[in-house]
Amino acid sequence: MGAEVFHSLKKVLGEKGLASGVGDEGGFAPNLGSNIRRAGYTAVISHRVAKYNQLLR
C-alpha cells in the first residue's frame, strides 16, 4: 500500500507542476524557498545567510 500511495502522490505533484524530488530518507523534498516565505521566516533566513557570508570572508 505504501508504494502505491508514494507513486500516486508523485503523479499528482507532477501534474500540478510541483517538485517531486526525493530526499535521502525517501520522502519528497519540498521547495524550501516558498515554505520559508509562507512561514514568515524570510527575514531570519536572510539574516543568517548574510552572517554566514561574513564568516567566509
Swiss-Prot record:
UniProt keyword Magnesium, yes or no: yes
Keywords for the protein's UniProt record, in alphabetical order: Cytoplasm, Glycolysis, Lyase, Magnesium, Metal-binding, Secreted
Stored Gene3D superfamilies: Enolase-like C-terminal domain
Record EC number: 4.2.1.11
Pathway it works in: Carbohydrate degradation; glycolysis; pyruvate from D-glyceraldehyde 3-phosphate: step 4/5
Cofactor mode of binding and number, as noted: Binds a second Mg(2+) ion via substrate during catalysis.
Subcellular location as annotated: Cytoplasm; Secreted; Cell surface
Keyword Lyase carried by entry: yes
Biological process, per Gene Ontology: glycolytic process
InterPro entries attached to this UniProt entry: Enolase-like_C_sf (IPR036849), Enolase_C (IPR020810)
Reactions performed catalytically: (2R)-2-phosphoglycerate = phosphoenolpyruvate + H2O
Active site (record annotation): 25
Major place of residence: cytoplasm
GO cellular component: cell surface; cytoplasm; extracellular region
Enzyme class: lyase
Cofactor: Mg(2+)
Molecular function terms, GO-annotated: metal ion binding; phosphopyruvate hydratase activity
Reported function: Catalyzes the reversible conversion of 2-phosphoglycerate (2-PG) into phosphoenolpyruvate (PEP). It is essential for the degradation of carbohydrates via glycolysis.
Similarity comment: Belongs to the enolase family.
Protein name: Enolase
Source organism of the structure: Clostridioides difficile (Peptoclostridium difficile)
